[in-house]
Each structure stands twice: as structure tokens, then as C-alpha cells.
A protein has these predicted regions:
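Compact, glycine-rich, soluble single-domain proteins
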Residues: 9-126
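Bacterial signal peptide processing site
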Residues: 4-6
Length: 126
């Protein structure tokens, strides 16, 4: 028998959260969500102690015009992944509060936590 524990159902990798610009209270989050189960996983919300509001958004280009729309519900396919990246799906983190060296994010489905993510900002160059 294998001595390893089973993989968690949902995993976040390549996490990057931008530090808000001085005087601004908004940030963006990028990551890859991987579903290790045989069933799709729904995500219908996100929260953070360091931001008053977190939304999932998607940037699309129509007729040469870039538009951003909110994603009400995201489905991570069974044994698949979804990428949040610049110019595509991303997290909008708004109303920064108590922002220090790290950010904790929670992803939700029907009011139940699906995944918790801790992200530490890289040290700023001197």
C-alpha cells in the first residue's frame, strides 16, 4: 500500500497577487486551480480578510475593445484545471484593509469553503 496521503480535491498553484499601488485599494490575483477529483467543482464566491470585496472577473476582447465582466460561478472540470491570468480570468481584490506582507483568500461554493490560499508578497527590492 502507498504511504502517501490522497491529494486534496482542489489545489492552487502559481499564485500571484499584485500589491496595490500606493494610494490605491485594488489588486488582482492570478493562479491555476487544479481539480483532482472525478467530479466538477463549483466556485461561486471568494473572500479575503485583507480586502473588503473579492470578485472573479474575465477580460474579453470584442471588436478590438477590452471588456471586463464578473464571473458569477466558475466550474473547475473533473481532473482538469482553470487558469487565472493577465488578460483572461482573474480575481479582483477591492477595498484593501489591514494589508501587510501576506494575503489569505478563501474560495466558496454555496456558503461552504472550498479552498484556502495563503500568499506572501515577495520582498520588495531595496
Amino acid at each position: 500500500a502507498a504511504c502517501s496521503s490522497p491529494q486534496p480535491p482542489l489545489v492552487a498553484s502559481d499564485v500571484e497577487i499584485t500589491r496595490p499601488m500606493p494610494g490605491r485599494h485594488m489588486s488582482a490575483g492570478y493562479l491555476v486551480l487544479t481539480n483532482n477529483t472525478d467530479a466538477p467543482i463549483r466556485i461561486d464566491g471568494a473572500t479575503s480578510r485583507q480586502f473588503g470585496m473579492v470578485e472573479m472577473h474575465e477580460t474579453t476582447v470584442e471588436d478590438g475593445i477590452s471588456r471586463m465582466r464578473e464571473i458569477e460561478e466558475l466550474v473547475v472540470p473533473a481532473n482538469g484545471s482553470v487558469t487565472f491570468e493577465r488578460g483572461g480570468k482573474h480575481l479582483m481584490l477591492m477595498r484593501a484593509q489591514n494589508l501587510e506582507q501576506s494575503v489569505s483568500l478563501q474560495l466558496w461554493c454555496n456558503g461552504a469553503p472550498v479552498l484556502s490560499i495563503e500568499y506572501a508578497f515577495p520582498d520588495e527590492p531595496n
